[in-house]
Structure formats: structure tokens, C-alpha cells
Amino acid sequence: LVPVALAEFDAVLGARPNQVDRLREEVDVAAAELLDVGVPGGEVTAEGVQMNVSVGLRYLESWLRGTGAVAIYNLMEDAATAEISRSQVWQWLRHGRIERDQVVAFEDAELAEAGEGRWDEARALFDEVALSEELDEFLTLPAYELID
């Protein structure tokens, strides 16, 4: 697939490494639009929040045990998926789409069903990267301090 992708990039970019020089004068975007996390016709659902909490916790718990790619709900997931999950939770909280209590309840339910492992550490880490006031650059950065 690399040759196919390169051909498409080359067709648009030519010899240029990027499109930084391509200004779109016809596009006028206000700051409020950049901050709007709404999706036309979409909504934040309890199922979506629960899934993000579950995936975030399950991935972090496995990562803390040294596994970087994890089967979660019959899909192979990695840090990028967990990053999306925790970022969505953080963003939904910041913009008032969900409540912290809802996230905590889903965490409680997830840990109630968990077996042995590093679940308490995973939860503390998820709270740090998803429930904090500031969004950390990447969820594994504070996690490195917890690796044996």
C-alpha cells in the first residue's frame, strides 16, 4: 500500500514536503468554531462514555504490565486508541457534555469486574490524564513513572 499512498501524496504535493504554503483565503474560521466539539447530528452517549472509560482503563492496565498491543472487545488496540479514549473523555468533561460522576461510576463498574492486575494504578493514571484540568501531552508520559 505504500506505493499507492505515495502516488496520491505525490500527485498533490509534487516535490514539496507539505502544504504549509497553501493558504486557504476562502476559509474563515473563528476561534469559537475551533473550540466547538459538537458533531452535527451526533451526540455523546452513555455507551460512548462507558466504552472510552473501559478501553482507557483496560489498555493502561495492560500497558503497566508491559503489553503494548492489547485485545479489547475483539480488536487489537494500542496507545493511540487509549489516547483517543481519554482525550474524548477529557474534552467532553471540559465542554460540559458529561459529568465527572458519570466517569467515576463507569470506572467503579469496570474495576468491580476486573480480575488481578494493576487496576488501581491504571485508574489513578486514567484519572490523571482524563479528569485533570490540563490535558497531558500523551497518556503514557506520566505512566513511565509507574513501570517496574
Kindly label every feature range from the protein language model:
Residues 1-148:
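Non-catalytic helical/linker scaffolds that mediate oligomerization, partner binding
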